[in-house]
């Protein structure tokens, strides 16, 4: 325990000398004439700035700690004033100041000193003050007096005139009416190391830590975790799935509330997939703006995407359909599997077959289209079927599974093709951004299958060099070389032909569904026409 904090209350003078027997400070008039002469020379040199007439009071502090009561007793031994402080956190109390006859200064100086220590705060005298203040530490003499006789406690000085350490003035035990018990407010002092505090603590101390046990701490909103998803949702997009929902509802006739709820779920999942796709592909831009993780950081972007997926499932519960919850889980599982294959081929530079590539597209891109139409069909079934314009009797909802699978394939293959050839895509994502990512598009898969061996080798080396570019992807010259190779292999024409074939199948499906329902779907036909290459 440090007593430096009490220094302003205890610095009443300067020490002049110590006892040869016990090393205690002694008053000036207790010292022999010869010693006084020496001490006067030394102390005057060290304290030349202290006035000669200043009275000197010597202080000694002793501290003891009671582990059972968690109380600390501080004895202040002052030549002229005796003060005992008992600390029971956080108040130091039970103080009795008594003047003794061993004071080397004048009676007035002793009285002033006692007053300065006791008048911090006045209290009524305590019955226990006499016993608390009468504790005095005895100083045993290590050697007997020179005449082999130990002076009695009632004798003040040794025969040689020095102070007797065993001297005790009986008047010190008397309780004087002018002595008061004072309350000294002191800083909180922790118990010594290894000693546990008492079970009953100060109420203020308990309230300081009440935050750790209270039940009503502030609630945290989803604003921060949702900010990255809100950002990607604000970027301009094609809204293909949203438009498809409106077009398909011409046949399925889902209620406006349910349709809006389904759109919300699909949009949340789509935005989450865009965030994760940009992180996993290493894309730095999306729709002409910085990718989400380039603004919010990769950890926060990933966390926000996971949060959106969880929130989407909560929105599914609002549809009130167990079938919809099962659809959500099944199609989300397919989405993860498809993305896993895409990442595996990219990381290992392993070219898939065309058949496996199409299966990957059905899982990765087609899952959200399939989830959309399955949600709508589930909510249509709750109403008993679809009503036609000519016949109000409900009929079974049409099977749109093949139609949405073809839509998913067309959308993904077209998107990859446009990334290699479209000036609009170049402005939004950069020139041939998919080559920086190393993605195996249908065009690249065809080129690696049908190019001469020399060109195949060059393509494989370019994809390998991409991994050693410190995340910079391919250079502009490398990208132009890839385009030249795929053109030479006829891969761009092959991709356009595949898109036209898929487009024709979509139109055939439209014709069949319109024939079954008797409802022409002009809105869906316009959407297909907009996507035509």
Curated annotation (Swiss-Prot):
Region of interest called Disordered, as start-end residue ranges on this chain: 98-169, 187-206
Binding site for Mg(2+) 1: 277, 281
EC number assigned by the record: 2.5.1.-, 2.5.1.1, 2.5.1.29, 2.5.1.10
Pathway it works in: Antibiotic biosynthesis
Example of a GO MF term: dimethylallyltranstransferase activity
Sequence ranges of Low complexity compositional bias: 98-138
Cofactor, how bound (note): Binds 3 Mg(2+) ions per subunit.
One matching Pfam family: polyprenyl_synt
Residues annotated as binding dimethylallyl diphosphate: 286, 364-365, 412, 419, 429, 439
Binding, isopentenyl diphosphate: 238, 241, 270, 287
Protein's GO biological process: alcohol biosynthetic process; antibiotic biosynthetic process; isoprenoid biosynthetic process; mycotoxin biosynthetic process
Gene3D superfamilies (UniProt xref): Farnesyl Diphosphate Synthase (1.10.600.10)
Catalytic activities: isopentenyl diphosphate + dimethylallyl diphosphate = (2E)-geranyl diphosphate + diphosphate; isopentenyl diphosphate + (2E)-geranyl diphosphate = (2E,6E)-farnesyl diphosphate + diphosphate; isopentenyl diphosphate + (2E,6E)-farnesyl diphosphate = (2E,6E,10E)-geranylgeranyl diphosphate + diphosphate
Cofactor (UniProt): Mg(2+)
Top-level EC class: transferase
Chain positions recorded as Mg(2+) 2 binding sites: 277, 281
Positions with a binding annotation for Mg(2+) 3: 415
Keyword entries, A-Z: Antibiotic biosynthesis, Isoprene biosynthesis, Magnesium, Metal-binding, Transferase
PANTHER family per UniProt: GERANYLGERANYL PYROPHOSPHATE SYNTHASE, THIJ_PFPI FAMILY PROTEIN (AFU_ORTHOLOGUE AFUA_3G01210)-RELATED
Family: Belongs to the FPP/GGPP synthase family.
Function of the molecule: Geranylgeranyl diphosphate synthase; part of the gene cluster that mediates the biosynthesis of sordarin and hypoxysordarin, glycoside antibiotics with a unique tetracyclic diterpene aglycone structure. First, the geranylgeranyl diphosphate synthase sdnC constructs GGDP from farnesyl diphosphate and isopentenyl diphosphate. The diterpene cyclase sdnA then catalyzes the cyclization of GGDP to afford cycloaraneosene.
UniProt-recorded name of the protein: Geranylgeranyl diphosphate synthase sdnC
Origin organism lineage: Eukaryota, Fungi, Dikarya, Ascomycota, Pezizomycotina
């Amino acid at each position: 325990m440090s007593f430096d904090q009490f220094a302003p209350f205890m610095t009443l003078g300067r020490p002049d000398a110590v006892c040869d027997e016990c090393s205690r400070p002694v008053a000036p008039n207790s010292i022999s004439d010869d010693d006084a002469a020496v001490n006067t020379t030394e102390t005057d040199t060290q304290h030349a700035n202290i006035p000669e007439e200043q009275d000197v009071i010597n202080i000694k502090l002793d501290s003891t700690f009671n582990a059972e009561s968690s109380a600390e007793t501080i004895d202040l031994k002052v030549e002229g004033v005796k003060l005992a402080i008992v600390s029971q956190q956080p108040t130091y109390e039970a103080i009795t100041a008594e003047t003794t006859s061993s004071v080397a200064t004048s009676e007035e100086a002793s009285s002033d000193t006692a007053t300065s220590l006791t008048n911090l705060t006045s209290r009524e005298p305590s019955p226990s003050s006499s016993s608390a203040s009468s504790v005095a530490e005895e100083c045993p003499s290590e050697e007997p007096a020179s005449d082999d006789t130990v002076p009695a406690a009632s004798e003040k000085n040794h025969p040689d005139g020095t102070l007797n350490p065993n001297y005790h003035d009986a008047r010190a035990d008397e309780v004087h009416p002018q002595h008061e018990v004072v309350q000294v407010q002191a800083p909180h002092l922790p118990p010594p190391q290894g000693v546990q505090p008492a079970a009953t603590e100060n109420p203020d101390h308990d309230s300081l830590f009440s935050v750790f046990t209270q039940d009503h701490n502030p609630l945290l909103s989803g604003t921060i975790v949702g900010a990255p998803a809100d950002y990607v949702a604000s970027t301009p997009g094609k809204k293909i799935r949203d438009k498809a929902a409106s077009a398909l509802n011409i046949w399925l006739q889902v209620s406006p509330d349910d349709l809006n709820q389904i759109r919300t779920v699909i949009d949340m999942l789509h935005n989450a997939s865009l965030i994760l796709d940009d992180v996993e592909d290493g894309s730095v831009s999306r729709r002409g703006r910085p990718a989400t993780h380039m603004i919010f950081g990769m950890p926060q972007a990933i966390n926000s995407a996971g949060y959106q997926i969880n929130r989407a499932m909560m929105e599914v519960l609002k549809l009130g359909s167990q079938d919809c919850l099962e659809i959500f889980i099944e199609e989300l599982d397919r989405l993860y599997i498809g993305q896993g294959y895409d990442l595996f081929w990219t990381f290992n530079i392993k070219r898939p077959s065309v058949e496996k590539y199409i299966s990957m597209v059905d899982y990765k891109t087609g899952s959200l289209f399939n989830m959309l139409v399955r949600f709508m069909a589930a909510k249509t079934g709750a109403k008993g079927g679809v009503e036609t314009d000519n016949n109000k009797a409900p009929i079974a909802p049409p099977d749109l599974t093949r139609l949405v699978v073809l839509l998913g394939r067309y959308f993904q293959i077209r998107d990859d093709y446009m990334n290699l050839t479209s000036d609009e895509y170049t402005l939004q994502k950069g020139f041939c951004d998919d080559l920086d990512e190393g993605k195996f598009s249908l065009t690249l898969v065809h080129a690696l299958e049908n190019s001469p061996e020399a060109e195949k080798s060059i393509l494989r080396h370019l994809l390998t060099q991409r991994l050693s570019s410190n995340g910079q992807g391919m250079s502009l010259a490398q990208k132009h070389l890839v385009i030249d190779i795929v053109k030479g292999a006829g891969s761009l024409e092959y991709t356009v032909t595949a898109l036209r074939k898929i487009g024709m199948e979509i139109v055939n499906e439209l014709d069949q569904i319109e024939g079954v329902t008797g409802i022409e779907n002009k809105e869906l036909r316009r959407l297909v026409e907009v996507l035509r290459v």
